[in-house]
From Swiss-Prot:
Family as reported in the entry's similarity comment: Belongs to the bacterial ribosomal protein bS16 family.
Gene3D superfamilies linked to this entry: 3.30.1320.10
GO BP field: translation
GO cellular component, one term: small ribosomal subunit
Pfam families: Ribosomal_S16
Species this protein is from: Variovorax paradoxus (strain S110)
Name of this chain's protein: Small ribosomal subunit protein bS16
Length: 87
């Protein structure tokens, strides 16, 4: 089964997450199929905190990839922030 989930990066105390498509059996920070974007929970006000390639996300969902609950929350958060960025 293919899943869309977070892969942790960054250093101790400064987390940074890549939003990746991977096989469910592969470890969290292991091999992945494609990187769709990132989430930076410690971003400052002038830095971008979430970026998701919406076209690739739609493709992977169309072929049956399941998003984790946290990634679903981030997708909604990115969609809400997108109109503000365009203005």
């Amino acid at each position: 089964m293919v899943v869309i989930r977070l892969s942790r990066g960054g250093s101790k105390g400064r987390p940074f997450f890549n939003i990746v498509v991977s096989d469910k059996r592969v470890r969290r920070d292991g091999r992945f199929i494609e990187r769709l974007g990132f989430y930076n929970p410690t971003a400052k006000e002038n830095e971008e905190s979430i970026r998701i390639a919406q076209d690739r996300l739609a493709y992977w969902k169309s072929v049956g990839a399941q998003a984790s609950p946290t990634v679903l929350r981030l997708i909604k958060q990115a969609a809400a922030a997108a109109p503000k960025a365009a203005a």
